[in-house]
C-alpha cells in the first residue's frame, strides 16, 4: 500500500513544490497539496478533510502573503492540523517565529546569537528616535515578508521622516535595523535538523543581496564556525528546515534572519548535493 502525505503550500504549481512532490512520488508516496486559502474548515468534523489520506506528517512550504487576519487564520489551521495528530515540518510555532521579524530577532538575541541592533515600534516619533539611536543609517523592513520585498535603506533624515510618516498613516509597524557594512554580499546556509547541508555567497552591485533583487550566487565552503552558527540559529527559532542568512562584518558574523520555508533553486546551482533529495530524506526520517 502506498504511503500518503501532504504538502502545505500557497501555490501547488510552484516550481520547488513540484520538485519536492516528484521526490515523494518517486518514493511511492501519494501526495496531496493543502492550500490554506482554499480550505473550508468544518469545525464540527475537522478530521474529515484528512480522513481519506490520513497522513502522519506534512511538509510546510508556506501559507502565502495575506492581511493579518488571514495570516492568523492560516496559522490557526496549522495548529488544528497538529492538534489532530499530524506532525508538521516545519511546525506551526516555527513558522510563526521565523516569519515574524520581531520574534525572529528576539529569539536569536535571547539565544546569544549575534544579530544587528534592532528597534520595533508603532509610533512615528519613536521610529525617528530609533533611526537616530541606530546612527542614522538603518534598514526598514516589513514585519512580515520575504524575498527582500518592501525593504528600504534610510540614511537621510529628511527621507526617513517622509517614509516613516507615510507608513505611520498606513498603520504600519516599524522594524528598524542598523545597517551593517557587508560589501554587498551575504551568506545563505541550508540547515536540516542538526546538519548544515550547503551554503552560498549572494553577491550584488548594491546593498540588497536577495536573489530576487538580482544577486548572483557563488559557492561557499562551510567552515565549522559557520556550520555551528547556522545550526544554532535554526534551533533558536525552533526551525528544522531552515535557510539562515548571515553577514560578515567588522564585528564578525551577524545573523540577519532565519527562513522557515527556504528556497533551494539558487543554492542548487552552486551545490554538488541534490538538495530536494536531502530535504525529502530529512522530512521522511524525522517522523
Predicted segments, located by residue:
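Protein kinase-like catalytic core scaffold
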Residues: 175, 197-198, 242, 254-256
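Active-site nucleotide/adenylate-binding loops and adjacent lid/helix of ATP-dependent enzymes
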Residues: 2-6, 53, 78, 83-84, ...
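A short glycine-rich, hydrophobically flanked beta-strand micro-motif that places a catalytic Asp/Glu
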Residues: 177-178, 239-250
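Phosphate-binding site of ATP-dependent enzymes
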Residues: 149-237
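C-terminal active-site "lid" helix and adjoining low-complexity regulatory extension at the edge
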Residues: 221, 235, 248-287
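Conserved N-proximal alpha/beta basic substrate-recognition cap immediately N-terminal to
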Residues: 11-117
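Short hydrophobic segments within beta-strands
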Residues: 7-10, 192
